[in-house]
Protein backbone atom coordinates (compact mmCIF):
# COMPACT_ATOMS: atom_id res chain seq x y z
CA UNK A 1 0.00 0.00 0.00
CA UNK A 2 1.50 3.35 -1.03
CA UNK A 3 2.43 5.81 1.69
CA UNK A 4 0.74 8.61 -0.31
CA UNK A 5 -2.59 6.75 -0.28
CA UNK A 6 -2.33 6.07 3.45
CA UNK A 7 -1.53 9.74 4.10
CA UNK A 8 -4.59 10.72 2.06
CA UNK A 9 -6.82 8.34 4.00
CA UNK A 10 -5.44 9.65 7.30
CA UNK A 11 -6.35 13.17 6.19
CA UNK A 12 -9.85 12.05 5.20
CA UNK A 13 -10.29 10.37 8.60
CA UNK A 14 -9.36 13.53 10.51
CA UNK A 15 -12.26 14.69 12.68
CA UNK A 16 -14.68 12.01 11.45
CA UNK A 17 -17.16 10.80 14.08
CA UNK A 18 -18.52 7.79 12.22
CA UNK A 19 -18.73 6.07 8.87
CA UNK A 20 -21.46 3.56 8.15
CA UNK A 21 -21.74 0.76 7.42
CA UNK A 22 -18.46 -0.04 9.13
CA UNK A 23 -17.03 -3.45 9.91
CA UNK A 24 -13.67 -2.81 11.63
CA UNK A 25 -10.62 -4.28 9.88
CA UNK A 26 -12.77 -5.57 7.02
CA UNK A 27 -11.16 -5.47 3.58
CA UNK A 28 -14.51 -5.89 1.84
CA UNK A 29 -15.26 -2.63 0.03
CA UNK A 30 -18.98 -2.84 0.81
CA UNK A 31 -18.30 -3.06 4.57
CA UNK A 32 -15.65 -0.42 5.16
CA UNK A 33 -15.28 2.96 3.47
CA UNK A 34 -11.53 3.06 3.98
CA UNK A 35 -11.14 -0.36 2.37
CA UNK A 36 -13.31 0.90 -0.50
CA UNK A 37 -11.04 3.91 -0.98
CA UNK A 38 -7.96 1.70 -1.01
CA UNK A 39 -9.40 -0.59 -3.68
CA UNK A 40 -11.47 1.62 -5.96
CA UNK A 41 -10.20 2.23 -9.47
CA UNK A 42 -12.43 5.25 -10.16
CA UNK A 43 -13.16 8.65 -8.67
CA UNK A 44 -16.02 8.35 -6.20
CA UNK A 45 -19.04 10.63 -6.18
CA UNK A 46 -19.08 12.40 -2.81
CA UNK A 47 -22.43 14.00 -2.09
CA UNK A 48 -23.21 16.87 0.24
CA UNK A 49 -26.46 18.78 0.21
CA UNK A 50 -27.17 22.26 1.53
CA UNK A 51 -30.56 23.89 1.73
CA UNK A 52 -30.29 27.64 1.07
CA UNK A 53 -32.60 28.59 3.94
CA UNK A 54 -30.55 31.61 5.04
CA UNK A 55 -28.09 34.11 3.63
CA UNK A 56 -24.99 33.29 5.70
CA UNK A 57 -22.75 30.27 6.10
CA UNK A 58 -20.80 30.03 9.35
CA UNK A 59 -17.80 27.99 10.49
CA UNK A 60 -20.08 25.24 11.76
CA UNK A 61 -21.29 24.67 8.20
CA UNK A 62 -17.74 24.78 6.88
CA UNK A 63 -16.71 21.55 8.64
CA UNK A 64 -18.45 19.28 6.14
CA UNK A 65 -17.53 21.55 3.22
CA UNK A 66 -13.86 21.24 4.19
CA UNK A 67 -14.18 17.46 4.27
CA UNK A 68 -15.74 17.64 0.81
CA UNK A 69 -12.68 19.61 -0.36
CA UNK A 70 -10.38 16.96 1.07
CA UNK A 71 -12.15 14.35 -1.05
CA UNK A 72 -11.71 16.63 -4.07
CA UNK A 73 -7.99 16.92 -3.36
CA UNK A 74 -7.84 13.12 -3.19
CA UNK A 75 -9.11 12.96 -6.77
CA UNK A 76 -12.82 12.37 -6.18
CA UNK A 77 -15.83 14.32 -7.49
CA UNK A 78 -17.73 16.51 -5.06
CA UNK A 79 -21.43 16.54 -5.87
CA UNK A 80 -22.83 19.65 -4.21
CA UNK A 81 -26.61 19.43 -4.05
CA UNK A 82 -28.31 22.80 -3.78
CA UNK A 83 -31.63 22.03 -2.15
CA UNK A 84 -33.63 24.68 -3.95
CA UNK A 85 -36.68 22.40 -3.85
CA UNK A 86 -36.29 21.01 -0.31
CA UNK A 87 -35.51 24.49 1.06
CA UNK A 88 -39.12 25.36 0.40
CA UNK A 89 -40.05 22.73 3.00
CA UNK A 90 -37.15 22.98 5.44
CA UNK A 91 -35.32 20.12 7.11
CA UNK A 92 -37.26 19.19 10.29
CA UNK A 93 -34.21 17.43 11.79
CA UNK A 94 -33.77 18.45 15.41
CA UNK A 95 -36.52 21.06 15.19
CA UNK A 96 -39.24 21.22 17.81
CA UNK A 97 -41.66 23.05 15.53
CA UNK A 98 -42.58 23.26 11.86
CA UNK A 99 -40.05 25.10 9.69
CA UNK A 100 -41.00 28.28 7.86
CA UNK A 101 -41.51 27.61 4.16
CA UNK A 102 -39.53 29.89 1.84
CA UNK A 103 -40.67 31.35 -1.45
CA UNK A 104 -38.81 30.46 -4.68
CA UNK A 105 -37.55 34.05 -4.81
CA UNK A 106 -36.08 33.84 -1.29
CA UNK A 107 -34.41 30.54 -2.14
CA UNK A 108 -32.90 31.90 -5.38
CA UNK A 109 -31.39 34.88 -3.55
CA UNK A 110 -29.89 32.64 -0.88
CA UNK A 111 -28.42 30.27 -3.48
CA UNK A 112 -26.28 33.01 -4.98
CA UNK A 113 -24.86 34.09 -1.62
CA UNK A 114 -24.16 30.46 -0.64
CA UNK A 115 -22.17 29.77 -3.80
CA UNK A 116 -20.08 32.91 -3.28
CA UNK A 117 -19.32 31.87 0.29
CA UNK A 118 -18.25 28.29 -0.50
CA UNK A 119 -15.79 29.35 -3.22
CA UNK A 120 -12.86 29.79 -0.80
CA UNK A 121 -13.42 26.22 0.42
CA UNK A 122 -14.20 24.07 -2.62
CA UNK A 123 -12.18 23.49 -5.80
CA UNK A 124 -14.21 25.16 -8.54
CA UNK A 125 -11.37 25.09 -11.08
CA UNK A 126 -10.08 21.52 -11.58
CA UNK A 127 -12.12 19.70 -14.26
CA UNK A 128 -14.11 16.76 -12.93
CA UNK A 129 -13.77 17.73 -9.28
CA UNK A 130 -17.07 19.55 -8.74
CA UNK A 131 -20.61 18.97 -9.90
CA UNK A 132 -23.25 21.44 -8.73
CA UNK A 133 -26.80 20.12 -8.96
CA UNK A 134 -30.15 21.58 -7.96
CA UNK A 135 -32.60 19.03 -6.60
CA UNK A 136 -35.49 20.73 -8.33
CA UNK A 137 -34.06 19.04 -11.46
CA UNK A 138 -35.63 15.76 -10.35
CA UNK A 139 -37.90 16.51 -7.40
CA UNK A 140 -40.04 19.01 -9.29
CA UNK A 141 -40.72 16.32 -11.90
CA UNK A 142 -41.96 13.61 -9.54
CA UNK A 143 -45.52 12.59 -10.28
CA UNK A 144 -47.97 11.29 -7.69
CA UNK A 145 -47.19 7.68 -8.58
CA UNK A 146 -43.50 8.20 -7.78
CA UNK A 147 -44.30 10.10 -4.57
CA UNK A 148 -46.49 7.22 -3.41
CA UNK A 149 -43.69 4.80 -4.24
CA UNK A 150 -41.31 6.82 -2.06
CA UNK A 151 -43.82 6.94 0.80
CA UNK A 152 -44.23 3.17 0.52
CA UNK A 153 -40.60 2.57 1.44
CA UNK A 154 -41.02 3.76 5.06
CA UNK A 155 -43.47 3.36 7.91
CA UNK A 156 -44.95 6.03 10.16
CA UNK A 157 -43.21 4.32 13.08
CA UNK A 158 -39.83 4.76 11.40
CA UNK A 159 -40.52 8.43 10.81
CA UNK A 160 -41.68 9.04 14.38
CA UNK A 161 -38.45 7.52 15.66
CA UNK A 162 -36.55 10.33 13.95
CA UNK A 163 -35.09 13.02 16.19
CA UNK A 164 -37.44 15.98 16.41
CA UNK A 165 -40.53 14.10 15.30
CA UNK A 166 -40.55 11.93 18.44
CA UNK A 167 -40.30 14.98 20.68
CA UNK A 168 -43.05 16.84 18.86
CA UNK A 169 -45.32 13.78 18.86
CA UNK A 170 -44.84 13.32 22.62
CA UNK A 171 -45.70 17.00 23.21
CA UNK A 172 -48.65 16.79 20.81
CA UNK A 173 -47.07 19.51 18.69
CA UNK A 174 -48.39 19.31 15.11
CA UNK A 175 -46.36 17.31 12.59
CA UNK A 176 -47.41 17.98 9.03
CA UNK A 177 -47.38 15.27 6.38
CA UNK A 178 -45.13 17.24 4.03
CA UNK A 179 -42.40 17.10 6.72
CA UNK A 180 -42.36 13.30 6.47
CA UNK A 181 -41.37 13.74 2.86
CA UNK A 182 -38.15 15.60 3.65
CA UNK A 183 -35.94 12.59 4.52
CA UNK A 184 -37.33 10.77 1.48
CA UNK A 185 -36.54 13.68 -0.81
CA UNK A 186 -33.01 14.01 0.57
CA UNK A 187 -32.63 10.27 0.14
CA UNK A 188 -33.92 10.44 -3.42
CA UNK A 189 -31.20 13.01 -4.15
CA UNK A 190 -28.71 10.18 -3.57
CA UNK A 191 -30.54 8.08 -6.14
CA UNK A 192 -30.62 10.89 -8.69
CA UNK A 193 -26.88 11.61 -8.50
CA UNK A 194 -25.75 8.01 -7.83
CA UNK A 195 -23.79 9.01 -4.72
CA UNK A 196 -21.04 6.70 -3.46
CA UNK A 197 -20.58 8.59 -0.19
CA UNK A 198 -22.80 11.15 1.53
CA UNK A 199 -21.35 13.60 4.03
CA UNK A 200 -23.26 15.25 6.84
CA UNK A 201 -23.32 16.24 10.48
CA UNK A 202 -24.14 13.68 13.14
CA UNK A 203 -27.75 14.90 13.07
CA UNK A 204 -28.07 13.67 9.47
CA UNK A 205 -27.56 9.95 10.07
CA UNK A 206 -31.25 9.12 9.68
CA UNK A 207 -31.57 11.02 6.39
CA UNK A 208 -28.37 9.50 4.97
CA UNK A 209 -29.55 6.02 5.94
CA UNK A 210 -32.80 6.69 4.06
CA UNK A 211 -30.68 7.46 0.99
CA UNK A 212 -29.00 4.06 1.31
CA UNK A 213 -32.39 2.35 1.54
CA UNK A 214 -33.71 4.17 -1.52
CA UNK A 215 -30.62 3.33 -3.58
CA UNK A 216 -31.28 -0.34 -2.79
CA UNK A 217 -34.98 0.08 -3.59
CA UNK A 218 -34.20 1.55 -7.00
CA UNK A 219 -31.50 -1.10 -7.58
CA UNK A 220 -28.51 1.18 -8.02
CA UNK A 221 -25.26 -0.72 -8.63
CA UNK A 222 -23.61 0.85 -5.56
CA UNK A 223 -25.05 1.91 -2.21
CA UNK A 224 -23.63 5.00 -0.55
CA UNK A 225 -21.58 5.11 2.62
CA UNK A 226 -22.43 7.69 5.26
CA UNK A 227 -19.68 9.86 6.75
CA UNK A 228 -20.61 11.95 9.77
CA UNK A 229 -18.80 15.01 11.10
CA UNK A 230 -19.28 16.66 14.52
CA UNK A 231 -21.68 19.50 15.20
CA UNK A 232 -19.45 22.46 16.10
CA UNK A 233 -19.93 24.02 19.53
CA UNK A 234 -20.33 27.79 19.29
CA UNK A 235 -17.98 30.46 20.58
CA UNK A 236 -19.83 30.46 23.91
CA UNK A 237 -18.54 26.94 24.56
CA UNK A 238 -22.03 25.72 25.47
CA UNK A 239 -24.47 25.32 22.60
CA UNK A 240 -24.00 24.39 18.96
CA UNK A 241 -22.91 27.20 16.67
CA UNK A 242 -26.00 29.05 15.50
CA UNK A 243 -26.80 32.44 14.09
CA UNK A 244 -29.92 32.67 16.23
CA UNK A 245 -27.83 32.17 19.39
CA UNK A 246 -25.23 34.75 18.38
CA UNK A 247 -22.37 32.31 19.06
CA UNK A 248 -21.22 31.99 15.47
CA UNK A 249 -18.46 33.16 13.16
CA UNK A 250 -19.74 33.88 9.65
CA UNK A 251 -17.55 33.22 6.62
CA UNK A 252 -18.35 36.75 5.42
CA UNK A 253 -17.09 38.48 8.58
CA UNK A 254 -14.18 40.87 8.37
CA UNK A 255 -10.71 39.56 9.13
CA UNK A 256 -10.59 41.53 12.38
CA UNK A 257 -13.96 40.29 13.59
CA UNK A 258 -13.18 36.67 12.69
CA UNK A 259 -9.73 36.78 14.31
CA UNK A 260 -10.98 38.46 17.46
CA UNK A 261 -13.75 35.92 18.02
CA UNK A 262 -11.52 32.90 17.43
CA UNK A 263 -8.74 34.26 19.61
CA UNK A 264 -11.16 34.36 22.54
CA UNK A 265 -12.89 30.98 22.33
CA UNK A 266 -12.81 28.88 25.53
CA UNK A 267 -9.63 26.85 26.02
CA UNK A 268 -11.64 23.62 25.99
CA UNK A 269 -12.70 24.23 22.38
CA UNK A 270 -9.35 25.14 20.86
CA UNK A 271 -8.13 21.66 19.93
CA UNK A 272 -11.46 20.68 18.37
CA UNK A 273 -11.60 23.92 16.37
CA UNK A 274 -8.05 23.35 15.12
CA UNK A 275 -8.83 19.76 14.14
CA UNK A 276 -12.05 20.61 12.28
CA UNK A 277 -11.42 24.09 10.87
CA UNK A 278 -7.73 24.00 9.89
CA UNK A 279 -5.04 21.78 8.40
CA UNK A 280 -2.58 22.50 11.20
CA UNK A 281 -0.69 19.34 12.27
CA UNK A 282 -2.16 18.11 15.53
CA UNK A 283 1.12 16.66 16.79
CA UNK A 284 3.05 19.92 16.78
CA UNK A 285 0.66 22.49 18.25
CA UNK A 286 1.91 25.16 20.66
CA UNK A 287 1.88 24.06 24.30
CA UNK A 288 0.23 27.15 25.77
CA UNK A 289 -3.55 27.51 25.15
CA UNK A 290 -3.16 31.21 24.31
CA UNK A 291 -0.64 30.40 21.58
CA UNK A 292 -2.96 27.72 20.20
CA UNK A 293 -5.79 30.25 20.05
CA UNK A 294 -3.58 32.60 18.03
CA UNK A 295 -2.52 29.78 15.69
CA UNK A 296 -6.17 28.84 15.19
CA UNK A 297 -7.28 32.41 14.50
CA UNK A 298 -4.43 33.02 12.05
CA UNK A 299 -5.06 29.77 10.15
CA UNK A 300 -8.81 30.32 9.79
CA UNK A 301 -8.55 33.99 8.81
CA UNK A 302 -5.88 33.06 6.24
CA UNK A 303 -8.34 30.63 4.61
CA UNK A 304 -10.99 33.26 4.01
CA UNK A 305 -9.02 36.51 3.74
CA UNK A 306 -5.53 35.45 2.66
CA UNK A 307 -2.37 35.12 4.73
CA UNK A 308 -1.19 38.70 4.20
CA UNK A 309 -4.34 40.27 5.65
CA UNK A 310 -4.44 37.64 8.41
CA UNK A 311 -0.91 38.50 9.53
CA UNK A 312 -1.68 42.22 9.33
CA UNK A 313 -4.82 41.74 11.43
CA UNK A 314 -2.93 39.69 13.99
CA UNK A 315 -0.29 42.42 14.30
CA UNK A 316 -2.84 45.23 14.62
CA UNK A 317 -4.84 43.49 17.32
CA UNK A 318 -1.67 42.53 19.18
CA UNK A 319 -0.60 46.18 19.11
CA UNK A 320 -3.74 47.18 20.97
CA UNK A 321 -2.93 44.67 23.69
CA UNK A 322 0.71 45.77 23.83
CA UNK A 323 -0.37 49.36 24.41
CA UNK A 324 -2.25 48.19 27.48
CA UNK A 325 -5.62 48.71 25.81
CA UNK A 326 -6.57 45.07 26.00
CA UNK A 327 -9.91 43.67 24.91
CA UNK A 328 -10.08 41.10 27.70
CA UNK A 329 -13.43 40.83 29.43
CA UNK A 330 -12.45 42.27 32.79
CA UNK A 331 -10.50 45.27 31.55
CA UNK A 332 -13.09 47.30 29.65
CA UNK A 333 -16.69 48.33 30.32
CA UNK A 334 -19.53 46.19 29.02
CA UNK A 335 -22.70 47.51 27.43
CA UNK A 336 -25.87 45.54 26.81
CA UNK A 337 -27.13 45.41 23.24
CA UNK A 338 -30.58 45.11 24.77
CA UNK A 339 -30.46 48.86 25.38
CA UNK A 340 -30.92 49.54 21.67
CA UNK A 341 -33.76 49.12 19.23
CA UNK A 342 -32.46 47.60 16.03
CA UNK A 343 -31.51 48.60 13.41
CA UNK A 344 -29.49 51.38 15.06
CA UNK A 345 -26.92 53.77 13.60
CA UNK A 346 -23.38 53.61 14.95
CA UNK A 347 -23.38 57.38 15.52
CA UNK A 348 -26.29 56.93 17.95
CA UNK A 349 -24.51 54.04 19.69
CA UNK A 350 -21.36 56.12 20.15
CA UNK A 351 -23.20 59.07 21.66
CA UNK A 352 -25.63 56.95 23.72
CA UNK A 353 -22.78 54.98 25.32
CA UNK A 354 -20.82 58.20 26.01
CA UNK A 355 -17.86 57.09 23.91
CA UNK A 356 -18.54 60.36 22.09
CA UNK A 357 -20.19 63.40 23.70
CA UNK A 358 -22.58 63.91 20.78
CA UNK A 359 -23.71 62.46 17.47
CA UNK A 360 -21.87 65.19 15.60
CA UNK A 361 -18.63 64.28 17.40
CA UNK A 362 -19.31 60.64 16.59
CA UNK A 363 -19.54 61.56 12.90
CA UNK A 364 -16.25 63.46 13.10
CA UNK A 365 -14.52 60.52 14.77
CA UNK A 366 -15.78 58.12 12.12
CA UNK A 367 -14.77 60.43 9.27
CA UNK A 368 -11.33 60.84 10.84
CA UNK A 369 -10.74 57.11 11.13
CA UNK A 370 -10.89 57.08 14.91
CA UNK A 371 -13.59 54.43 15.34
CA UNK A 372 -12.98 50.67 15.23
CA UNK A 373 -15.36 47.77 15.71
CA UNK A 374 -13.51 44.62 16.74
CA UNK A 375 -10.32 46.10 15.35
CA UNK A 376 -11.81 47.02 11.97
CA UNK A 377 -11.82 50.72 11.11
CA UNK A 378 -15.31 52.10 10.39
CA UNK A 379 -15.35 55.01 7.92
CA UNK A 380 -19.01 55.07 6.86
CA UNK A 381 -20.94 57.61 8.93
CA UNK A 382 -24.14 55.77 8.04
CA UNK A 383 -22.87 52.42 9.35
CA UNK A 384 -25.82 50.61 10.94
CA UNK A 385 -26.03 47.69 13.35
CA UNK A 386 -28.87 45.68 11.84
CA UNK A 387 -29.35 43.10 14.63
CA UNK A 388 -27.74 42.41 18.01
CA UNK A 389 -26.50 38.83 17.46
CA UNK A 390 -23.46 39.53 15.23
CA UNK A 391 -22.06 42.07 17.70
CA UNK A 392 -22.13 40.06 20.93
CA UNK A 393 -18.63 40.18 22.53
CA UNK A 394 -17.35 42.65 19.93
CA UNK A 395 -15.31 45.63 21.09
CA UNK A 396 -16.12 49.21 20.07
CA UNK A 397 -13.15 51.58 20.23
CA UNK A 398 -12.81 55.36 19.88
CA UNK A 399 -9.29 56.71 19.66
CA UNK A 400 -6.63 54.92 21.71
CA UNK A 401 -8.21 55.00 25.16
CA UNK A 402 -11.97 54.51 24.92
CA UNK A 403 -13.38 50.97 24.71
CA UNK A 404 -16.51 49.02 25.49
CA UNK A 405 -17.58 45.44 24.92
CA UNK A 406 -21.08 44.55 23.72
CA UNK A 407 -22.91 41.88 25.71
CA UNK A 408 -26.40 40.41 25.08
Swiss-Prot record:
The organism of origin for this protein: Thermosynechococcus vestitus (strain NIES-2133 / IAM M-273 / BP-1)
Protein task: Catalyzes the attachment of tyrosine to tRNA(Tyr) in a two-step reaction: tyrosine is first activated by ATP to form Tyr-AMP and then transferred to the acceptor end of tRNA(Tyr).
Keywords: Aminoacyl-tRNA synthetase, ATP-binding, Cytoplasm, Ligase, Nucleotide-binding, Protein biosynthesis, RNA-binding
Enzyme class name: ligase
Protein encoded by which gene: tyrS
Assembly with partners or alone: Homodimer.
Record Gene3D superfamilies: HUPs, RNA-binding S4 domain, Tyrosyl-Transfer RNA Synthetase
Record has ATP-binding as a keyword: yes
This protein's name: Tyrosine--tRNA ligase
Domain S4 RNA-binding: 344-408
Positions of short motif 'HIGH' region: 52-61
Main location: cytoplasm
Binding residues annotated for ATP, in chain numbering: 243
Entry keyword annotation includes Ligase: yes
InterPro entries according to UniProt: aa-tRNA-synth_Ic, Rossmann-like_a/b/a_fold, S4_RNA-bd, S4_RNA-bd_sf, SYY-like_C, Tyr-tRNA-ligase, Tyr-tRNA-ligase_bac-type, Tyr-tRNA-ligase_bac_2
Family recorded in the similarity comment: Belongs to the class-I aminoacyl-tRNA synthetase family. TyrS type 2 subfamily.
GO biological process, one term: tyrosyl-tRNA aminoacylation
Enzyme Commission no: 6.1.1.1
Amino acid sequence: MSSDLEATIARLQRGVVETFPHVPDSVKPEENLWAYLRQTQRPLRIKFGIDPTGSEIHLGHSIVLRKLRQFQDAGHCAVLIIGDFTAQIGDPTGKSEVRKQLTPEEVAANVQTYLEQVRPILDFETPGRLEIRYNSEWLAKLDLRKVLELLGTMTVGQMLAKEGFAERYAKETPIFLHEFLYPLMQGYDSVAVAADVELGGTDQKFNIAVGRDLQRHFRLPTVQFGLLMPILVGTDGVQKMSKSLGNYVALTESAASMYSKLEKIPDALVNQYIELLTDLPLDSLPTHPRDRQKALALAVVSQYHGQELALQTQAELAAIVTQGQTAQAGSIPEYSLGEFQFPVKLTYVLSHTKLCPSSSEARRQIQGGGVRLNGEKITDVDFTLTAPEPYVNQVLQVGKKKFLRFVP
